[in-house]
A protein has these predicted regions:
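C-terminal helix-coil-helix/basic helical segment that borders enzyme active sites and/or dimer interfaces
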Residues: 99-102, 227-236, 259-266, 300-308, ...
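Glycine-rich phosphate-binding loops that contact phosphosugars or nucleotide phosphates
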Residues: 127, 163-164
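Conserved N-terminal diphosphate/IPP-binding helix and adjacent helical/loop segment
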Residues: 1-114, 118, 124, 128-143, ...
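Alpha-helical phosphate/pyrophosphate-handling elements in metalloenzyme active cores
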Residues: 2-4, 65-114, 165-166, 205-248, ...
Length: 376
């Protein structure tokens, strides 16, 4: 049986268990070889961090300390630390989008910080709902400070995000806030879908893509437009940048799904087979179940048996490895990798429909390339 996505044209990725040829996807663009993606990410982090720290300092104790721990600025005892603050993809995109509108990168900083606050609000709640005990190579907030603090600090970060934008007091800030709140609502919808899918035997590829578009694509789309909106861009430009960001988000999540099963824990900061431990209906799993064939059928049987178990505490590493191997044998790993490349291509093509400085376009291309080859 072959799994296909509709309306994707000649680049449609396929998986098969019957010996058919899997079409290749063009490699990630090399048009921006001169762009240093590490420098792009660091610029976004450098511009956003002072404003982010000042925002966190507004929080009442102990929420300020708990948030500082989450961002890696202090350790569990309150001592200064140099923790891993994440990849900083969203801040980088926000300041780049300001440049796309012809504004200085600094114009996008309030948007960069607002998006980063919403992103981390979602991580705090997500870790608690999923029972994740590790993030960025350290214990999660709920594990150290308790579930109540994780919930409260997450709520506070969401409030701060809107506060920072509205304090600008401009028409552009109002437009930016509307886009951010719309993206946040979509993110919450996606999280609700994700949780509900954990308790279903079957989820379609289309449902999975919709969920991941909401959960990851919406906020990345906002990051790609919010700086441009603050810089005075019209809705056509902002909407096009959002399209780039939405499909970049789907590519990003597809890679995350691969790392959630086959990623190196040293690089990801999470347990081996982390998504399998949480019964996630991620793209590799959904695609493998939809593929048909012996490996797909056996995987379905095992996952149905797993659903009857209250937890996976007694599962051996070998049992998780068996499930991962069946997903790969059924074609779920290969299909998801190709889907990441397909979404990457759609994102890049969106950039061709609007005007922006050539060096900024090259930055967007390079960052998209980074997303599909990253290891964490």
């Amino acid at each position: 049986m072959t799994l296909e996505l509709s309306a994707a044209g000649p680049r449609t990725p396929r998986i098969t268990t019957r010996g058919e040829t899997v079409p290749t996807v063009p490699p990630a663009s090399t048009a921006a070889d001169a762009v240093d993606v590490t420098a792009l990410l660091e610029r976004g982090r450098t511009l956003a961090t002072p404003v982010l720290r000042a925002a966190i300092n507004r929080l009442a104790p102990p929420m300020d300390t708990v948030a500082a721990y989450h961002f890696g600025w202090i350790d569990a005892e309150g001592n200064p630390a140099e923790g891993d603050g994440g990849k900083a993809v969203r801040p980088a995109l926000a300041v780049m989008s300001a440049e796309a509108a012809g504004a200085a990168p600094e114009v996008g900083v309030p948007g960069a910080v607002a998006v980063e606050l919403v992103h981390n609000f979602s991580l705090l709640h997500d870790d608690l709902m999923d029972g994740d005990e590790q993030r960025r190579h350290r214990d999660t907030v709920w594990k150290v400070h308790g579930p109540a603090q994780a919930i409260l600090v997450g709520d506070a970060l969401f409030a701060l995000a809107n506060e920072l934008l509205l304090e600008l007091g401009t028409v552009e800030a109002g437009r930016a806030t509307r886009r951010l709140t719309t993206a946040t609502r979509a993110l919450i919808d996606g999280q609700a879908q994700d949780i509900s899918y954990e308790h279903r035997d079957r989820v379609s590829v289309e449902e999975c893509l919709e969920m991941e578009g909401n959960k990851t694509g919406a906020l990345l789309a906002c990051a790609c437009s919010i700086g441009a909106v603050l810089g005075g861009a019209d809705d056509v430009t902002a909407d096009t940048l959002e399209k780039y960001g939405y499909h970049l988000g789907l590519a990003f999540q597809a890679v995350d799904d691969l790392l959630g099963i086959w990623g190196d824990p040293v690089a990801t900061g999470k347990q081996t087979w982390s998504d399998l431990r949480q019964r996630k209906k991620s793209l590799p799993v959904v695609a493998a179940l939809a593929a048909g064939g012996p490996a797909s059928d056996r995987l379905g049987e095992l996952l149905a048996e797993d659903a009857k178990s209250s937890d996976f505490e007694n599962f051996s590493e070998e049992e998780f490895a068996v499930r991962a191997a069946l997903i790969e044998e059924a074609g779920g790993r290969e299909w998801t990798a190709q889907e990441a490349r397909r979404q990457h291509t759609i994102a890049i093509e969106a950039l061709d429909t609007i005007l922006m400085p050539d060096h900024v376009r090259a930055q967007f291309v390079e960052l998209a390339d980074f997303v599909v080859v990253r290891k964490r």
